[in-house]
Amino acid sequence: MKNNGISIRLIIMNFLQYAIWGAYLTSMGSYLVNIGLGAKIGIFYAMQGIVSIFMPAIIGIIADKYIQAQKVLGLCHGIAGLAMIAAGYYGLVAGDSVNFATLFSLYSISVAFYMPTIALSNSVAYSGLEKFGMDTVKDFPPIRVFGTVGFICSMLFVNFMSIDGVQFQLSYNQFFTSGVIGLVLAAYAFTLPACPVAKGGESKSVAEAFGLKAFALFKKKDMAIFFIFSMLLG
């Protein structure tokens, strides 16, 4: 990779971006079972998909028209991290008497602001690479790989770390871990290269912001078949 300076900075961003997710995504169910919310596991995971329907578009409009993407990335991670830490603190205080509505509300706020950051982090990376004259097609994939590395490292940390004989993967400490990493990335995001915002005549329509124009691709038989089998495999 050319220009190692920006590459390393974006590697760190991607590592932290997915480490946040890896801290609880595979282990949250075990904690919910331990506190008597095993029947609600599906609802917790479904919320990630629900907020992903509209939050990325809303945050994307803000980043596209009003505030630089790296700043929006930092703000979103700040809110998501604080909400996740609050969820962990509530789990600590409540012990085995966790109220579903309270924990779920805090968790939902966190994922509502986390899910848009996946696309935002890609936008920040593309902008940074282009600013330094690099090829996004060739130079971004090796950077993105470290997102997967971050996810795995965070997951393993939670799986093997324990306090008083209780593994993080079985307790609220996984939320603390995710939240702290989120706050670190929130601060780090503000140090990343500035991303341009759209000029007055370049604003996107609502259809473009929500990605609705992509459905036109399904007019092509090959794309429709690919999409159907992708859903079956996913």
Model-derived features: where do they sit?
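Helix-loop boundary and gating motifs at the non-cytosolic
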Residues: 1-53, 222-230, 234
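Juxtamembrane intracellular "pre-TM" segments in multi-pass secondary transporters
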Residues: 1-4, 192-229
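Hydrophobic core of transmembrane alpha-helices in multi-pass small-molecule transporters
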Residues: 15, 83, 96-120, 231-232
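Helix-to-loop junctions at the C-terminal end of transmembrane segments
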Residues: 54-68, 162-163
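Cytoplasmic membrane-interface "Motif A"-like loop-to-helix N-cap segments
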Residues: 64-78
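C-terminal ends and interior cores of transmembrane alpha-helices
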Residues: 78-97
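Cytoplasmic helix-loop-helix junction between adjacent transmembrane helices
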Residues: 106-146
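Symmetry-related core transmembrane helices of the 12-TM Major Facilitator Superfamily/SLC fold
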Residues: 172-191
